[in-house]
Structure formats: C-alpha cells, structure tokens
Amino acid sequence: MVVLGSTGSIGTNSLEIARKFNIEVEALACAENVKKLNAQIAEFHPKFVYIKDEKLKSKVAHNKIFSGENGICEMLNRCESKTVINALVGFAGLIPSLKIQNSGKILCLSNKESLVVGGKFLDTSKIRAIDSEHFGLKFLLENSAKPAKMIITASGGAFYKTPIKDLSSKKAADALKHPNWNMGAKITIDSATMANKLFEMLEAFWLYGCKNLDALIEPSSSVHALIEFIDGSTAAHLSRTDMKLAIAHAILPNLKSEILKPVDLLSLNLKFEKIDIKKYPIFELKDEVLSNPDLGVIINAANEIAVFAFLQGKCGFLDISSTIFKAVEKFNDLTPENAEDLIKIDKIVRNFARSELRL
C-alpha cells in the first residue's frame, strides 16, 4: 500500500496496521518531518518517498525521492499498489484523491477536505472512509433497513466546558488540548470550533446520499454514530477512541482479527446534548451546506487560513468562525464545474480571508 501523510496521526496508525498484518508499504509521503520519515523508511523499506519541501530532499535517507507541488502525483504514477491511504491535511489532499481514483486505485480517505471541497467530482461509492463516525455509519448500514436519519457525535472539543464569555481570550495552546483524541493540530482546532463536525456531515452526505443528518455532543467519544430507522428503532456504534479500527477496516475490508478491546460498558456514563450555536456558531451553517454542498470549498478555504493564523497567534479564536461567515456571504453564488474551478475558488477565498484577517 501507499501512505500519504505517513508521519501524521492517521499515517502513523496506518503503519501500525501494516506492521501487524505484514502489509508491504510501497511508498511514503510527508510534508517536513524528516526524522520520522527516515525512521519509517528504515523499517518499511518503501520503493519511493515524497517530501513536500524540496530543500529537505538531501536529508531524506532514500534514493528515489519526489518533492514539490506535483511530486505526489508523479510518485503515484510509479506506484503499483492498489491501495492508497490519503491522510494529507487540508485542500492539498484533493488532487491526490482525484489522481488515485482516476488511476483505478482504492482510495482509503482520511483527508476529509477532498469530500468537503470536491465530493461531487469523486466516485464516493468506491471510497473507503477513514473516520470513526463514517466507519460507524457504514457498519450500522450493513444488512440494515433503509435509514430515516443519520446522526454523528462530537466530543465538544477542548472548550466543551468553557463558558462562552471566555472563548475570545483562548489561545492555540488551550484549543490543542483535546479531551479524548490524539490528533494533528488543525483537526484539533476544527474540533474546538465544530468545523470538523460540519465537514463530517458533508462527508456523510457524499458517502451515503442522506440529507437528514444531524450531530450531537457525546462527551466521552464512545458513541461515534447512530442511525434512526423508519420503524422507530435506533442503532448505535460504539468503540474506543482509537483510529486503528477505522483504518484496519479500510485497508482490510474482510477483517476478522481483534484490533481494539471492546468498550467497557459498565464504565460508560453516556449523555447526549444538542450543539449550542452560541458556543459553536459555525454549526449554524449545517442546513445551508447540506442544501448547497458547493459551499464546502468556500468554508474550507476560509477555515484553513483562519485556523493556521490562529495557530500562529495572528488572530483570535472567534475570528475563525467570523471569517468563515464573511466568506460564505461574499462567495455563496460560486459554483465549481470541475476540479480547475475548485482550485480557482479556493485561491480567491484564501486571498479574501487573508485580507479580512490582515495577514
């Protein structure tokens, strides 16, 4: 298999699954973590590697190295593996996702932005989603009656217990303290703003064709997804907070081995809550984005600029949501007709967001 984003959380867990099941790793790709990439090269002996920054090529312990803007697609052209894990972060994952599908390979997708931005240009019936919520929905849908409603859950993020009046003063270090999951910086901030849950609802729309979608806060992150059926019954999917389960099922669809220990039902203290729009204003866009999924590229571009500005201390926490709302208001009439349009719209919105944040 090929692992794009191999040094991140999903990539690292994917390689743990490869190690456990003796899966050959043909290629690895990362942005800049040379030390971790070299350790992975030493263990898995890939044929090809990619590093985003060309200046770092000399530090990579390999003789077949790709880099630069088109390097991942060039590397994929050389790869014979049928399975590719796309665990890249942000909009940068879109073109590789399109390339993977166009080449007939199996796309195991952790890069949610590919669906958020370009879901209508991907064959979602052939995507194996690496996400605890969407794996949960898939698990519940198998051998089940037609669903009436799908529900995914949110932990509430780092500021779940923080009073609304205190949010404006919160810094990146505060937002990065997720109560349940060990994730990368961007997705942890997205969890705190609830942008991550908005994205996951759009993912669920593209993956399963259901518009009757909702999300609830379940603070323990033990319940990942629920489905309400027409007959009035409800099914829930529970597992420990470990992405290796979703990854293993994406890589090995006929999996019959233990990946995680079962949830200790006797220790659970489950409760569900509505998502408070005053605390998580981004979630107010839920119905609008489900009725007009083309907004995904606008929301994602504004969010990426604002999140990375926040991480660098260049804007406040609440500026993330306000920047997104301004971008949606200004560009909601833009409709991408192809992948090239997505790239153009993404660039326009990013420039607008930078201007609004005075970056």
UniProtKB/Swiss-Prot annotation:
Cofactor dependence: Mg(2+); Mn(2+)
InterPro entries, A to Z: DXP_reductoisomerase, DXP_reductoisomerase_C, DXP_reductoisomerase_N, DXPR_C, DXPR_C_sf, NAD(P)-bd_dom_sf
EC number: 1.1.1.267
Catalytic activity, as annotated: 2-C-methyl-D-erythritol 4-phosphate + NADP(+) = 1-deoxy-D-xylulose 5-phosphate + NADPH + H(+)
Top EC class of this enzyme: oxidoreductase
Binding-site list for 1-deoxy-D-xylulose 5-phosphate: K112, S132, E133, S155, H178, S191, N196, K197, E200
Annotated binding of NADPH, by residue: T7, G8, S9, I10, A31, N33, N111, E113, G184
UniProt-recorded Gene Ontology molecular function terms: 1-deoxy-D-xylulose-5-phosphate reductoisomerase activity; manganese ion binding; NADPH binding
Pathway: Isoprenoid biosynthesis; isopentenyl diphosphate biosynthesis via DXP pathway; isopentenyl diphosphate from 1-deoxy-D-xylulose 5-phosphate: step 1/6
Binding site for Mn(2+): D131, E133, E200
A single BP term in Gene Ontology: isopentenyl diphosphate biosynthetic process, methylerythritol 4-phosphate pathway involved in terpenoid biosynthetic process
Keyword set, alphabetical order: Isoprene biosynthesis, Manganese, Metal-binding, NADP, Oxidoreductase
A Pfam family hit: DXP_reductoisom
Family membership noted in the UniProt record: Belongs to the DXR family.
Function noted in UniProt: Catalyzes the NADPH-dependent rearrangement and reduction of 1-deoxy-D-xylulose-5-phosphate (DXP) to 2-C-methyl-D-erythritol 4-phosphate (MEP).
Protein name listed in UniProt: 1-deoxy-D-xylulose 5-phosphate reductoisomerase
Lineage per the UniProt record: Bacteria, Pseudomonadati, Campylobacterota, Epsilonproteobacteria, Campylobacterales
Gene that this polypeptide is encoded by: dxr
